[in-house]
């Protein structure tokens, strides 16, 4: 698959995300790997529902620097961290869905555990609803370097698959392709909504 096709698919996914209302008020950021050294990352302050390929900046994975001098998204360091930690990751999606944002505040533990839902099989490697999906929840931090360091430390100690939540902030997920990252996003968002509804009903 060519870089141009991957980027075109990412633009289409960004428009889909925008139509869903999952990146309101220009929030969120999305990227696709170019090669081992560079990725293409959405520019800061752009409406994700109206992006074109010109709205993506080439970013060096090792330094999180954009050679063009244009301003990449605030969470650039999280995208480059994922590409560094997971050589098989080729696309990263960071969104601000209401379910992810609220659920990340309800969960007081460092990890969210989800089980019993058939839709868990939308996540690569999950084959049954009987398994438990673990989604790490990290405290939000405006210091992206410090946040990236905590996530990297977690990944050294524990398995980190599919994505993670930032408390009061949103969801970051990834995949081996744009298509897989999109499936992980849609699957996790559905699971988060189910978890939210289940918790609400259990309180009645």
Swiss-Prot record:
- Give the EC number(s) listed in the UniProt record: 4.2.1.109
Example GO molecular function term? zinc ion binding
Kindly give the InterPro entries that the UniProt entry links to this protein: Aldolase_II/adducin_N, Aldolase_II/adducin_N_sf, MethylthioRu-1-P_deHdtase_MtnB
Q: Name one GO biological process term.
A: L-methionine salvage from methylthioadenosine
Q: Per the record, GO CC terms?
A: cytoplasm
* Recorded metabolic or biological pathway in which this protein acts: Amino-acid biosynthesis; L-methionine biosynthesis via salvage pathway; L-methionine from S-methyl-5-thio-alpha-D-ribose 1-phosphate: step 2/6
What are its cofactors? Zn(2+)
What does the entry comment about cofactor binding? Binds 1 zinc ion per subunit.
Q: Does the keyword Protein biosynthesis apply?
A: no
According to UniProt, the reaction catalysed is: 5-(methylsulfanyl)-D-ribulose 1-phosphate = 5-methylsulfanyl-2,3-dioxopentyl phosphate + H2O
Q: Does the keyword Glycosyltransferase apply?
A: no
A family per Pfam: Aldolase_II
Q: Which keywords are on file for this protein?
A: Amino-acid biosynthesis, Lyase, Metal-binding, Methionine biosynthesis, Zinc
Identify the residues that bind Zn(2+).
Answer: 94, 96
Question: What protein family does this chain belong to?
Answer: Belongs to the aldolase class II family. MtnB subfamily.
**What function is annotated for this protein?**
Catalyzes the dehydration of methylthioribulose-1-phosphate (MTRu-1-P) into 2,3-diketo-5-methylthiopentyl-1-phosphate (DK-MTP-1-P).
Name recorded for this polypeptide: Methylthioribulose-1-phosphate dehydratase
Q: Which organism is it from?
A: Citrobacter koseri (strain ATCC BAA-895 / CDC 4225-83 / SGSC4696)
């Amino acid at each position: 698959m060519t870089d141009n096709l991957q980027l075109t698919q990412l633009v289409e996914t960004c428009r889909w995300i925008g139509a869903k209302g999952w990146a309101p008020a220009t929030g969120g950021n999305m990227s696709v790997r170019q090669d081992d050294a560079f990725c293409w990352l959405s520019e800061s302050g752009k409406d994700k529902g109206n992006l074109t390929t010109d709205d993506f900046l080439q970013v060096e994975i090792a330094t999180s620097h954009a050679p063009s001098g244009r301003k990449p998204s605030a969470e650039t360091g999280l995208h480059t961290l994922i590409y560094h930690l997971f050589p098989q990751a080729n696309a990263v999606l960071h969104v601000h869905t209401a379910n992810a944002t609220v659920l990340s505040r309800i969960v007081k533990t460092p990890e969210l555990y989800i089980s019993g839902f058939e839709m868990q099989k939308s996540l690569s490697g999950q084959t049954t609803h009987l398994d438990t999906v673990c989604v790490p929840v990290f405290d939000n931090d405006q210091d992206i370097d410090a946040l990236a360091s905590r996530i990297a430390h977690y990944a050294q100690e524990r398995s980190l698959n599919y994505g993670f939540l930032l408390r009061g902030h949103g969801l970051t997920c990834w995949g081996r392709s744009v298509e897989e990252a999109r499936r992980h996003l849609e699957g996790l968002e559905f699971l988060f909504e189910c978890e939210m509804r289940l918790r609400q009903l259990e309180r009645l």
